[in-house]
């Protein structure tokens, strides 16, 4: 069903059930001839653990089982004490992205370019503080507040690239229902403000900036319409590229300014490494 909706450019919003439904949503892209970027708002990475529930172990299946269409996994809001050091190291080893709760809560805008590059967004409601979600059956003293989680869903909605969206792992209570309804409302509001920029727009609508760093040339693009930024991931010769053409990676003005100071943006470096793994 998700596959058919995505083919028809209809965005499915999946509400309810456990978060391992993310795996089924991911598999819906198998026949769409594309690599998939998954963004999860979650307090843990959901790798398979001994005696773990399926809802807390779906990511291992996505990474291991074929066909392997996953290009990037990005986690927003993980809390260190819920994740082993081995899991954190594995995220780094695979050049995935992970942003701690405090990092995102302090500067919510750090999530915008992450969502702008997402195809599939999966939100675990247990990433929200219980005092805001109303979930006291599985008490979470820390997490995003109501304003922050709605800001994140709005970023997901406004992303031109997001084609499926899910909200999972909540208890069917009237308290949580109010928050989830508002999260979905903000996603839909964000969708109404989509600007149809990259990958749909023409490069003529962008200003191109070339920044030399050592033996590299970083190519940035800034949109005339929204003022948003992208950085080019080049197609490398003589290696196997997962991305079969030159691609633009969403970034920020701060990434451009850092490049001008000879600092290579971390998201660009990780994307380069993933592309040739």
Show which residues each predicted segment covers:
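Conserved alpha-helical scaffold segments that buttress catalytic/binding sites
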Residues: 1-167, 171-277
């Amino acid at each position: 069903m998700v596959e058919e909706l995505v083919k028809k450019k209809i965005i499915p919003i999946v509400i309810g059930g456990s978060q391992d439904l993310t795996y089924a949503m991911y598999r819906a892209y198998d026949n769409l001839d594309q690599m998939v970027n998954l963004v999860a708002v979650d307090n843990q990475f959901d790798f398979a653990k001994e005696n773990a529930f399926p809802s807390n172990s779906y990511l291992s299946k996505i990474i291991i089982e074929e066909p392997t269409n996953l290009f990037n996994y990005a986690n927003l809001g993980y809390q260190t004490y819920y994740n082993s050091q081995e899991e954190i190291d594995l995220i780094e080893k695979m050049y995935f992205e992970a942003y701690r709760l405090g990092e995102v809560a302090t500067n919510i805008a750090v999530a915008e370019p992450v969502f702008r590059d997402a195809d599939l967004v999966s939100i675990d409601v247990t990433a929200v503080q219980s005092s805001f979600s109303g979930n006291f059956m599985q008490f979470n003293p820390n997490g995003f507040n109501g304003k922050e989680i709605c800001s994140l869903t709005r970023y997901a909605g406004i992303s031109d690239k997001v084609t499926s969206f899910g909200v999972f792992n909540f208890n069917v209570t009237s308290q949580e229902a109010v928050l989830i309804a508002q999260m979905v409302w903000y996603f839909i509001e964000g969708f109404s403000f989509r600007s149809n920029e990259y990958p749909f727009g023409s490069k003529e609508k962008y200003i191109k900036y070339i920044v030399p760093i050592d033996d590299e040339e970083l190519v940035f693009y800034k949109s005339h319409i929204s003022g948003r930024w992208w950085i080019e991931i080049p197609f490398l010769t003589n290696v196997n590229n997962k991305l079969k053409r030159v691609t633009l990676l969403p970034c920020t003005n701060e990434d451009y300014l850092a490049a001008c100071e000879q600092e290579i943006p971390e998201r660009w470096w990780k994307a380069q490494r993933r592309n040739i793994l």
